């Protein structure tokens, strides 16, 4: 006794302070929301929802006390009676018993390890006593109920209720509560999904204890044991149309806060609405499906190896794999569990099976064991997509191989209004809106023509649309026809390649490369060749949207952003975006009059030229430009109103021909129209602001001091093929093909770090072309 007293006197003062339990801050996941508060993403290894003790039902509290600590309400942290009983049982060779109280488990979970030593047990007992002196019994229970690990990545009983039963903890029945109460002792051993028999034995033990403690009646125990329990896999209800945006926000949060981003319970509100996201996703998917119609079957998405799996366990293995898959547009992921010459049996999540005969397999009817498909041939273990038809039967389908992106931003602030980075985020998280570096073709020409206006050209400058050869390179118009002397306005309206090259030649490549960087492109993205006039730079759809925003907002460079506000776990505002705003804090990169003239020309493109299909929207405030690259590998349309800029792109991840005649105006523009029809619905037609210093004369728009072309420009209007030229007749509204040229390359754009001296809420002037956060 004397030694124990000395040990206590020596050890007790050295015990750690109880800040962790007094000021409990549980690990809570990062949650990302749309602008209106719909969950679009949840990240964190620990599934936990902090819940106050009064929100846990009495039936659960009683079940846990009956399971873990019968005398919880009476002891001082250590159950002396339980310790003596366990010691006698262990010494007599009986079943090994533990005697750790709930308070001791709290002490262990917060401060100690699980090592089985007398020193640890001694410290645990002293800590339990210290905790009992500091906190009330309900406070201790609250810590335990929120911190304890209960399997399936669930921490705390509120999370476990969701994970195992997909219900709120307050709604648990006695049977469900006693199943969960059995988990703390050994979450894996008593997992009701994996080990239902052991879980039931543990449940029966707890129910018997509850009867013994007069918490329930024998009849209630019997009813609970007879209750048929349904275990339902829980998934956070995340909007499936906003996953690319959520991932962008997650990456930015990780850059700012590191691993703490996933444990501090941050609540992040983004700039996108679920309605816009749905419209954007629908527009992109319907376009890509239409382009993929009639394409040959590409084969299984994946092959699972069942060679070491017993036949009776194949369905369980398939179920385990499918637990992390998602149905997209009615295309259900399935695993082939039987395959022969007559057909297949496809296993779907939840135990559903579909038997498909060869004739039912649609596009995949020749895919069983097909050597031409290699390892993508259908066999046992193949992961495929099936779809239910109107008559109730199933068939094999596939996701489009062709990909695309849509990004829509606020022209005045850069706030992302909608963003879709591909057909299916679950299949491939690569975000084509921000990461895919592709040639924009003629969609890049507006930047070239803006440079021309700055250099001394006007919208009415006459340039020869005629064959031209420069050091062995002969760019051509896609239809092989030439119109002779036409204005810059006409040239851009009908996307004339030879005119674009001539004006680039007159400006000089060095000047042109430097000028287009004003729109946000970097030098390494722009090849040092005249071919940049035809769009051989390597750019992302997001960069194109930001670039066109300069025209839309009157000459200011805004920067895109998706995070609007960040709150902590207690709903305190932690940070708020301070965007660069056109006309206020955003840097002016081109003359507002230049932007106005370019918008005037691009309005013609969108209403009379290659983008004339936009007339279907019945609006007078639209401007934009189509784009197509060589061999029809990429198709674009970027268009805008004074308030919204939307860029769309279509192409294969590994560039190849989309198909003959796949012009931007033919396949990309319809996607743009479908989205903008929704985005602009109910919004009044707005006018582009006419800046001071603009003159309108003879139906054309000029800068006041430049109403004629600079006579010193070295513009070459000669041609060695005059016979090829015909007077301008409005050609078909289609995009010009990009001739062979140098390819530029660039890596993913670097996300600028948020400056430590973030601007105040007053949004003072800033010369940096980057948004910043105001942090409280």
Residue spans of the language-model regions?
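N-terminal type II signal-anchor transmembrane helix
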Residues: 1-33, 71, 91
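Non-catalytic, structured segments within soluble enzyme domains
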Residues: 4-5, 93-349, 517-518, 522-523, ...
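Short active-site loop at a secondary-structure junction
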Residues: 49-54, 366-375, 399-404, 427-447, ...
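Active-site SXXK
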Residues: 64, 210, 280, 341, ...
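Short, well-structured active-site flanking segments
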Residues: 73-82, 155-158, 217-221, 430, ...
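Conserved catalytic neighborhood of penicillin-recognizing serine enzymes
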Residues: 89-116, 170, 237-241, 412, ...
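A penicillin-recognizing enzyme superfamily signal
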Residues: 270, 274-277, 281-286, 312-317, ...
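Mid-domain, small-residue-enriched loop/turn segments at the edges of structured enzyme/sensor domains
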Residues: 474-477, 508-546, 555, 562
């Amino acid at each position: 006794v004397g030694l124990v007293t000395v040990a206590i006197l020596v050890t007790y003062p050295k015990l750690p302070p109880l800040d962790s339990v007094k000021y409990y801050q549980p690990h809570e996941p990062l949650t990302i929301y749309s602008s209106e508060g719909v969950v679009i993403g949840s990240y964190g290894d620990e599934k936990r929802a902090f819940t106050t003790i009064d929100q846990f039902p009495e039936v659960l509290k009683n079940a846990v006390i009956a399971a873990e600590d019968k005398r919880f309400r009476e002891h001082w942290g250590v159950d002396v009676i339980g310790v003596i009983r366990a010691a006698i049982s262990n010494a007599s060779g009986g079943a090994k018993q533990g005697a750790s109280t709930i308070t001791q488990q709290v002490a262990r979970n917060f401060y100690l390890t699980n090592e089985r030593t007398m020193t640890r047990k001694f410290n645990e007992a002293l800590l339990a006593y210290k905790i009992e002196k500091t906190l009330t019994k309900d406070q201790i229970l609250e810590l335990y109920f929120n911190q304890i690990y209960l399997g399936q990545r669930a921490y705390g009983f509120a999370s476990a209720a969701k994970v195992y039963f997909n219900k709120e903890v307050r709604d648990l029945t006695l049977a469900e509560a006693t199943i969960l109460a059995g988990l703390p002792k050994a979450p894996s051993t008593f997992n009701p999904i994996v080990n239902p028999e052991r879980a039931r034995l543990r449940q029966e033990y707890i129910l018997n204890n509850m009867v013994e403690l007069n918490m329930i009646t024998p009849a209630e125990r019997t009813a609970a044991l007879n209750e048929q329990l349904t275990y339902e896999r829980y998934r956070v209800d995340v909007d499936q149309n906003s996953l690319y945006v959520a991932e962008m926000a997650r990456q930015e949060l990780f850059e700012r806060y590191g691993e703490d981003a996933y444990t501090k319970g941050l609540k992040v509100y983004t700039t996108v609405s679920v309605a816009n996201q749905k419209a954007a996703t629908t527009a992109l998917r319907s376009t890509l499906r239409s382009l993929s119609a009639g394409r040959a079957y590409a084969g299984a998405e994946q092959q699972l190896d069942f060679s070491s799996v017993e036949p009776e366990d194949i369905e369980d293995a398939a179920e385990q794999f499918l637990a992390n898959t998602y149905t997209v547009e009615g295309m259900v992921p399935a695993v082939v569990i039987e395959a022969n010459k007559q057909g297949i049996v496809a296993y779907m999540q939840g135990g559903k099976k579909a038997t498909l005969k060869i004739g039912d397999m649609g596009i995949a009817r020749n895919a069983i064991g097909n050597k031409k498909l290699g390892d993508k041939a259908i066999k046992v273990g193949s992961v495929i997509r099936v779809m239910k038809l109107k008559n109730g039967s199933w068939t094999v389908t596939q996701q489009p191989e062709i990909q695309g992106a849509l990004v829509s931003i606020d022209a005045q602030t850069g706030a992302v209004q909608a963003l879709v980075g591909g057909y299916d985020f679950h299949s491939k998280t690569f975000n084509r809106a921000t990461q895919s570096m592709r040639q924009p073709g003629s969609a890049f020409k507006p930047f070239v023509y803006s440079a021309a206006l700055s250099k001394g050209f006007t919208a009415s400058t006459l340039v020869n649309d005629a064959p031209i050869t420069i050091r062995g390179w002969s760019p051509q118009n896609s239809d092989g026809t030439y119109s002779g002397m036409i204005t810059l306005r006409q040239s851009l309206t009908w996307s004339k390649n030879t005119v674009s090259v001539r004006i680039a030649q007159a400006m000089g490549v060095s000047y042109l490369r430097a000028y287009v960087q004003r729109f946000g492109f970097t030098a390494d993205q722009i090849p040092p060749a005249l071919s940049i006039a035809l769009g051989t730079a390597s750019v992302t759809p997001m960069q194109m949207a930001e670039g066109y925003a300069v025209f839309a907002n009157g000459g200011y460079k805004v920067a895109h952003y998706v995070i609007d506000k960040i709150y902590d776990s207690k709903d305190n505002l932690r940070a708020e975006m301070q965007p660069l705003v056109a006309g206020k804090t955003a840097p002016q990169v081109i003359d507002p009059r230049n932007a106005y003239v370019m918008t005037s020309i691009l309005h013609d493109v969108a209403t009379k030229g290659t983008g004339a299909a936009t007339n279907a929207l019945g609006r007078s405030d639209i401007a934009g430009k189509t784009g197509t690259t060589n061999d029809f590998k990429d198709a674009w349309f970027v268009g805008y109103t004074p308030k919204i800029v939307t860029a769309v792109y279509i192409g294969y991840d590994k560039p190849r021909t989309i198909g003959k005649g796949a012009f931007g105006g033919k396949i990309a523009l319809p996607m743009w129209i479908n989205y903008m029809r929704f985005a602009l619905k109910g919004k009044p037609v707005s006018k582009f602001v006419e800046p001071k210093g603009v003159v309108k004369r003879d139906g054309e728009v000029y800068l006041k001091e430049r109403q004629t072309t600079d006579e010193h420009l070295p513009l070459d209007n000669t041609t060695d093929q005059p016979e090829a030229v015909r007077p301008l007749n409005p050609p078909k509204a289609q995009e010009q093909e990009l001739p062979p040229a140098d390819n530029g390359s660039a890596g993913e754009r670097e996300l600028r770090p948020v400056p430590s001296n973030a601007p105040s809420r007053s949004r003072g002037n800033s010369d940096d072309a980057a948004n910043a956060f105001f942090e409280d």
